[in-house]
Amino acid sequence: SGLAKNIKDTLESTPYKGDTINVSTPRISDILMNDVRWYGFDTENPNHVDVLINFAHNDFDQTKILEIAHRAWKNDSTKYIINFSSRASQPNISKGHLYASQKSSLNHLSNNLTYNSDKSYKLTTLNLGLLNHDDLPSLTWQDVSGMIYMLITSYPSIEIPEVTVQAHANYQDVQSDKTTLNEVYYHLHTDIL
């Protein structure tokens, strides 16, 4: 996706401690198929990773990937998992019921692992608001990429379990405008048909 490419480009082009950050972009299926045997979890493999950005939403796969990464890295304090979730994970604010449930599942597991397990790795869940919208106040890809860079590089001894990030605009106003735009879009397309 455009956001994934932007994150990769930002991390690889912004020096950190005199070096660049190498980014690997595995497919969801590679991790799900290989479980804890995925090459990125194998520290003996030259292509292993130190940070897993649990990014791609596909049903409940992000929750499954978090559980696999937890088992792989449970005892490794040098590893870091960053989940991409959504403001929609919060109770009763999203009209996308299944999407909200999938993101809520990810947040629930993340909180359980943070507060009820003996994990050693760092874990952050980013709840993103509206992203890269042409007509409404929204986060840009660069906003999110900068946040990822900051999380990875700025706080080596601090764990930030959860952060909600959104454009500086009144939530109810944005949602109302979003509903209006969706209705206009719907009527334009149904009138054409």
Where do the language-model regions lie?
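Canonical Rossmann dinucleotide-binding motif of NAD(H)/NADP(H)-dependent dehydrogenases/reductases
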Residues: S1-G18
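Short, hydrophobic beta-strand segments that form beta-sheet elements in well-ordered domains
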Residues: P15-I28, L52, T125-N127
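Adenosine-cofactor binding site in Rossmann-like domains, unifying the SAM/SAH pocket
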Residues: D19-E44, H57-K64
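Rossmann-fold scaffold of SDR-type NAD(P)-dependent oxidoreductases
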Residues: V49-N58, I65, Y80-N83
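Catalytic loop of short-chain dehydrogenase/reductase
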Residues: D61, K74, T78-D118, N127-L136
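Short-chain dehydrogenase/reductase
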Residues: L66-H70, L109-S110, I148
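Rossmann-like NAD(H)/NADP(H) cofactor-binding core
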Residues: Y121-N127, P161
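C-terminal helical subdomain
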Residues: L136-L193
